[in-house]
From Swiss-Prot:
Required for the formation of a threonylcarbamoyl group on adenosine at position 37 (t(6)A37) in tRNAs that read codons beginning with adenine. Is involved in the transfer of the threonylcarbamoyl moiety of threonylcarbamoyl-AMP (TC-AMP) to the N6 group of A37, together with TsaD and TsaE; this reaction does not require ATP in vitro. TsaB seems to play an indirect role in the t(6)A biosynthesis pathway, possibly in regulating the core enzymatic function of TsaD. Its main location: cytoplasm. GO terms for biological process: tRNA threonylcarbamoyladenosine modification. Transmembrane segments: none annotated. The four proteins YwlC, TsaD, TsaB and TsaE are necessary and sufficient for tRNA(NNU) t(6)A37 threonylcarbamoyladenosine biosynthesis in vitro in B.subtilis. It holds the Pfam family TsaD. Disruption phenotype: Cells lacking this gene display a slow growth phenotype. Cell size, shape and nucleoid morphology remain unchanged. Signal peptide: none annotated. This is tRNA threonylcarbamoyladenosine biosynthesis protein TsaB. InterPro entries: ATPase_NBD, Gcp-like_dom, T6A_TsaB. It comes from the Bacteria. The keyword tRNA processing applies. One of its GO terms (cellular component) is cytosol.
Amino acid sequence: MTILAIDTSNYTLGIALLREDTVIAEYITYLKKNHSVRAMPAVHSLLNDCDMAPQDLSKIVVAKGPGSYTGVRIGVTLAKTLAWSLDIPISAVSSLETLAANGRHFDGLISPIFDARRGQVYTGLYQYKNGLLEQVVPDQNVMLADWLEMLKEKDRPVLFLGHDTSLHKQMIEDVLGTKGFIGTAAQHNPRPSELAFLGKEKEAADVHGLVPDYLRLAEAEAKWIESQK
């Protein structure tokens, strides 16, 4: 089985090729650039480097969000188009779960974080058990202050991952003290190779029914709905 993994859900643009249990190619950038004009060329480049054609792919795996609304849509649309045109399965993985996978060697809880503005974050709680990543608390959009108080009650070490942790480092330290750990710079980029491994084990989704998981409405949508009441 050869899997193509695609992640455009945040600043990170990640593409990976997984053949059986071997990562044969991986492309990652962390740049504030338009994924819509870079994602497909990156896929073609990676395939060409590996002397492969799209028809050699067995499955598509995509990061479904949360994250940048535009970024999530780009990745999901590209992945669905490829899966449909090639008539191969597609699986979707939480962007937070993908980031949490970077905490593989941490003995404790893992909280990946994307900033959601106004004191809110997208996050969830994960841990590794017997070498496998499992979800402890579902992904959600939550006030960071409330989230940290919940983590404090668990009284366990917590590893925070994601570039946006820099925005909240002081609050994390103030609430959790020595129980709060910030990941290294290398751990803050979600890796498409981890996305591929996670998606390999997930059931195939309906290619037409698969939609991004924003965890909340885009601001413009929310305002429109409110105006209709």
